[in-house]
From Swiss-Prot:
It is found in: Cytoplasm. CDD domains: HisF. Heterodimer of HisH and HisF. Gene3D superfamilies: Aldolase class I (3.20.20.70). This is Imidazole glycerol phosphate synthase subunit HisF.
Length: 258
């Protein structure tokens, strides 16, 4: 059985780790390089840096953060935010990233994903999907989700399931799936959406948005069918450590690397 991955996510703004609720009201949570080092030492499987302002602000600082992190951290590093061209990807890979996460630029020009996969390999390409529920069935269960871009501010009218399918066919190596309804709420992942997209594609799906306790990670893997789970504030503010979370998952019969 493939071990499930635990991935701390570092939302970075102007070179600092921040964590907000639904992308607003940001609170400074520290230095990204120090945080990354701590997670590496604790046994995180991977790290994700999201430059949450790069899509509509400056981005040069991020390269420096990636370079300094890669010098000290030896687990796979994914970088997203403001990745718009193959040159952006190349620069991040040269700085020390292992994968690049593409979001708004893929929506704007889906061919970019195909071009990136052809040039760098699917293993370097992650498509980030930020989605909100837009339709419920008569029992109130979520049944349809739409893609939003620009930090959740811009609706696109694109169906999330169809988009995930299309991005897989274009060569994406994995999907980073964030529920904009759940992000920062600490109420757990959007399990119906996670399960629907995990079932719709054959590439790995990383669940994101809404973790408040280890039980939510377990639900994302078990009910959501995710291959990996991503969380931010529960780790940044030391509510739980990576070893605590991994022991909890192992005790609940989830295969993890200890």
């Amino acid at each position: 059985m493939m071990a499930k991955r635990i991935i701390p996510c570092l939302d970075v703004k102007a070179g600092r780790v921040v964590k907000g609720v639904q992308f607003e009201g940001l609170v400074d949570a520290g230095d990204p390089v120090e945080a990354a080092k701590r997670y590496d030492e604790e046994g995180a499987d991977e790290l994700t840096f999201l430059d949450i302002t790069a899509t509509h602000e400056d981005r040069g600082i991020m390269e420096d953060v990636v370079r300094r992190t890669a010098e000290q951290v030896f687990i796979p590093l994914t970088v997203g935010g403001g990745i718009r061209t193959n040159d952006d990807i190349r620069r991040m890979l040269v700085a020390g990233a292992d994968k690049c996460s593409i979001n708004s630029a893929a929506v704007k020009r889906p061919e970019f994903v195909r071009e990136a996969a052809e040039q760098f390999g699917s293993q370097c390409v992650v498509v980030a999907i930020d989605a909100k529920c837009v339709e419920h069935d008569k029992h109130g269960r979520p049944i349809r989700w739409e893609i939003f871009t620009h930090g959740g501010r811009q609706p696109t009218g694109i169906d999330a399931l169809e988009w995930a399918h299309r991005m897989e066919s274009f060569g994406s190596g994995e999907i980073l799936l964030t529920s904009m309804d759940k992000d920062g709420t600490k109420s757990g992942y959007a399990l119906e959406m996670t399960r629907a997209i995990s079932d719709a594609v054959t590439i790995p799906v990383i669940a994101s948005g809404g973790v408040g306790e280890p039980k939510h990670l377990l639900e994302g893997l078990r009910q959501g069918g995710a291959d990996a789970v991503l969380a931010a504030s529960i780790f940044h503010f030391r509510e739980y450590t990576i070893p605590q979370v991994k022991r909890y998952l192992r005790d609940n019969h989830i295969a993890v690397r200890l």
